[in-house]
Amino acid sequence: MESPTHPKPSKDKTLSWNLVFLVGILFTIDIGMANPSPHQVYNVTWTITNLVTGTKANATSMLGTLTDAFPTMYFDLCDIIGNTWNPSDQEPFPGYGCDQPMRRWQQRNTPFYVCPGHANRKQCGGPQDGFCAVWGCETTGETYWRPTSSWDYITVKKGVTQGIYQCSGGGWCGPCYDKAVHSSTTGASEGGRCNPLILQFTQKGRQTSWDGPKSWGLRLYRSGYDPIALFSVSRQVMTITPPQAMGPNLVLPDQKPPSRQSQIESRVTPHHSQGNGGTPGITLVNASIAPLSTPVTPASPKRIGTGDRLINLVQGTYLALNATDPNRTKDCWLCLVSRPPYYEGIAILGNYSNQTNPPPSCLSIPQHKLTISEVSGQGLCIGTVPKTHQALCNETQQGHTGAHYLAAPNGTYWACNTGLTPCISMAVLNWTSDFCVLIELWPRVTYHQPEYVYTHFAKAARFRREPISLTVALMLGGLTVGGIAAGVGTGTKALIETAQFRQLQMAMHTDIQALEESISALEKSLTSLSEVVLQNRRGLDILFLQEGGLCAALKEECCFYADHTGLVRDNMAKLRERLKQRQQLFDSQQGWFEGWFNKSPWFTTLISSIMGPLLILLLILLFGPCILNRLVQFVKDRISVVQALILTQQYQQIKQYDPDRP
């Protein structure tokens, strides 16, 4: 740091006065956030406090992230001085102080310098020295040598106050007069504030952790003793909508069956739209869905239980699927998986909105980092994308400079390296070297044909091979932004315009919020059992539905039956009914002989045990006599041959002689 050309002696910089009562103020703890999402928008309040009197010189609130919420703060020098600079009236022309308009006016032209107290430098002294015991401790101010610093957190400069300080009649007027005391004086201001100061945060201050207030000392540069003023800067971070505590333990308070009042009858009747195009529409009966022209808001602040939350998730999936291709929902089973991931993302191309102030979507970012472990497809990427993830990018943008907020289109999210968010801050993105992919978020719901489910629950289930399971993400991916629809979504308008898709989005938002609240409850819970239970929270939720008969357990999935009448609530009863119908149809197609094996459980075992010996005995009775006769005849023939051989051994053959031959 550059020292002044004509420094004053160090003895002019010292003053022995006790400020022990400031210790309690200097160690005030700020509100901290445990593992927040870097794109989370908070209500950030910055406060400048007079450490001698404890009064606030300035309090500025703004919405923003912890990376870009650093406003420019304006305050008056007398707000951090109070009455501590009021010199004796016998001192000739002191030229400073805040008790009189003339002193406030003369103080305007006096240079000042500021020294940090958070640096803990021994040579700079303590509060009694204004942290400026020796030259070189100053880091900012308004003096002829212009002190600067590369490591301090703030800069303090003089501001400009508009007004006329000397009236035409020779009298004095202007903002240095307090209008509460001099109400008839022209240009008088509130409190006589005519020494404005401007505080700005440096790049180092934007990167530091403001987990507590930080103090500085301000001193006037004048001949003789330099008066001292002490002030602190602190940050208070509050969520936009503070969470409400419910019950002694927040880990499992919502595991309860669906309420009868909130059950949704999802009966739909197809009709043709009256508008141009003639696309078929859907009419909902008793469905708690907001109209298309009004935003979706919860019907009541009452917390919904596990049954309502998960069934609403499947209900929204069914409505979205039925709106795109009703042929798929004639007879099907929609299954929730019990193992993570519970959601999957489809990378898409879309037009995001670029705003300088946080949009409403930025105010609903979860406080914790939620990870999407499965993202497929190719879409829009922003930031520095590593080579391992470039396969997800069809288009890559470097983003924007400055404090901008990029809001994802309705129904989409940004899947960032730091977590899932509907809105990203470019200040955070540039500072952390993060990258984000624009995705559609879909619940992990699998689609099964009824034959597969019924065969699995049949008593004699046989599988040649595992059937291919389709997920809703593959069937509906790409519909929210009006792009090319995958799977069954071809030929329909964008789901973003339908109430069915809005209900699905509302159900997903409620479920994600419940998962995030469970994480928060786990952080605050002191019960070890709840920590073990929450590790498989979704598995417990699905088990709860299975035990209540609300869904059918298929391997590690919780399945709900759906047809054109809607989503069935009592799925186990529906499963038993369909299995009974399937068995009756199977019995009607069997013959009388095949039916014997289904009448008694022991009959099949008995038949299979004695059938072998009976067949052997029957074969012996049928073919035994023939075989025995052939064997006896063979023996007789052999005996005859032996007898002939014996006779030939006892006699000799006589030679025959022909007399006609010589």
Curated annotation (Swiss-Prot):
GO terms for cellular component: host cell plasma membrane; membrane; viral envelope; virion membrane. SUPFAM superfamilies: ENV polyprotein, receptor-binding domain (SSF49830), Virus ectodomain (SSF58069). Residues 245-279 are annotated as: Disordered. The chain crosses the membrane at residues 607-627. Residues 468-488 are annotated as: Fusion peptide. InterPro entries: FMuLV_rcpt-bd, TLV/ENV_coat_polyprotein. Gene3D superfamilies: 1.10.287.210, ENV polyprotein, receptor-binding domain (3.90.310.10). The record marks 465-466, 645-646 as: Cleavage. A motif (CXXC) lies at residues 332-335. Residues 534-550 are annotated as: Immunosuppression. A motif (CX6CC) lies at residues 551-559. Keywords: Cleavage on pair of basic residues, Coiled coil, Disulfide bond, Fusion of virus membrane with host cell membrane, Fusion of virus membrane with host membrane, Glycoprotein, Host cell membrane, Host membrane, Host-virus interaction, Lipoprotein, Membrane, Palmitate, Signal, Transmembrane, Transmembrane helix, Viral attachment to host cell, Viral envelope protein, Viral penetration into host cytoplasm, Virion, Virus entry into host cell. PANTHER family: BC035947 PROTEIN-RELATED (PTHR10424:SF72), VIRAL ENVELOPE PROTEIN (PTHR10424). This is Envelope glycoprotein. It comes from Feline sarcoma virus (strain Gardner-Arnstein). The gene is env.
